[in-house]
Amino acid sequence: MIHFNVPPFVGTEFKYMHEAVENHKICGDGPFTKKCDEWLENRFKAERVMLTTSGSTALDMAALLCGIKPGDEVILPSFTFSSTANSFVLAGATLVFVDIRPDTMNIDETKIEAAITEKTKVICPVHY
């Protein structure tokens, strides 16, 4: 089997998952979320950080915050999760797919500029 993504394990995962479940804090409003928020705010000197429960939710929020409306174009890689496209389509955008680099599976940065038009509102790279 070829694994698409292998998350790292450091040995404390079950302890922390048990603590979150035991305290009924599994939906993003618990102490672990607060610790992550604070760490990210400090690390990136951000005024405010907001973790989401999924990448799909984060992309939905991004489409809203970018003010995507019908007629706007969004550039994204030709190889990505369906939620990348769905979030912007649901906001009314026209998708512009750009080929990926076979060595990284990420959007081919040398092809982005040719895809930009006066209607381009967002470039949404996805990293693997």
Where are the language model's segments positioned?
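Phosphate-binding glycine-rich loop
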Residues: 29-73, 87-90, 97-99
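Short alpha-helix boundary/capping motifs
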Residues: 10, 30-31, 52, 78, ...
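N-terminal "arm"/small-domain region of PLP-dependent enzymes with the aminotransferase-like
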Residues: 1-26
